[in-house]
Amino acid sequence: MVVTSNGKCEWAKEMKEFDETKAGVKGLVDAGISKIPQFFVHPPESLATPSKTTKNVQLELPTIDFEGVQTGGAGRKEVVEEIRKAAGIWGFFRIVNHGVPLHIMDAMLEAVKRFHEQPVEEKKLLYSADSSQRVKFNSNGPLREYDSACWRDILTCVFHDDQLDPEAIPLTCRKEVQEYVKCMIQMREIMAELLSEALGLSSDHLSSIECMKSEALACLYYPICPEPEKTLGTDKHSDTTFLTLLMQDTIGGLQILHDDQWVDVPPVRGALIANIGDLMQASLTIISNDKFISVEHRVLAQPVGPRISVACFFTPSLRAGAKPFAPIKEILSVENPALYREFLFREYCQYYKTKGQDVTSALPHFRIERILP
């Protein structure tokens, strides 16, 4: 954000007042504001469009049809090849006919809306910026001084090794969260097989190393914004995960950075969006060694809304996350050496958090520097 001469005091004051309400961004909207608080204003370079534009070129996210993928045969091989191409070129792809029932998806979106639109007194009980709290409600989590806040509220539910005490989940969305996570775990198993095969590994490889054994469910609520041109729903970033599966409603606003162009990802009812995380690209087990890419993306603030989305972030099991991993020997060679050093999952996350908005990906920090002969 832009910091004026007395900006230090103003930033701290506004942030403190906002946090103390424990009402989130929706609380500001409900109060009838016509201008957004200064700490939500993003610098021009953050809002700017890259040098290239999509005015003359229509780019469209790859869509992959999973129909019959579990029966094997030529259809599965075709899907694996499509995933390999999309993950290596785009880092994102849309999935249709994935097997998650539409009524469960709709119920989950409605439950998220119901949670965020309940009385503030109910949500306050979960308001926290403590990253160790497995179920919490907040807007941005801990921000570094002068970082710009994003125009959204989040309910987060973290399942370590697929487990979370049901009583910890808010009653207003408990049933829907449990049912949706079951579907996400089933999708994870399918995706783990297909991604393994796309990397040229045995289909059980990713499952065996437990690199996606935990889930963090981010239930996002993007309220209508009175000045959407000044802020963002979610700032530019890449995911500090292994894989993310996203469900979004009909509002839209998601953009991915492809070939230095912001590409809109319009909603498709019943579809899921898969995106490769930083850990898939290079960290944790250094699985893909840049065969797959984790790309930056953002969500625009909107003059309409609310926009509802649910992101399921897959991360390592507690056991796998506690160990450093080396590059997989099967995909390394003299021509294809390791690109990143070993590191722990927590080491990556800690570095990412310390950099705040100064970095959209922590991958360069762990890349091996090579001196050319």
Predicted segment positions?
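Peripheral, non-catalytic segments flanking oxidoreductase cores
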Residues: 1-373
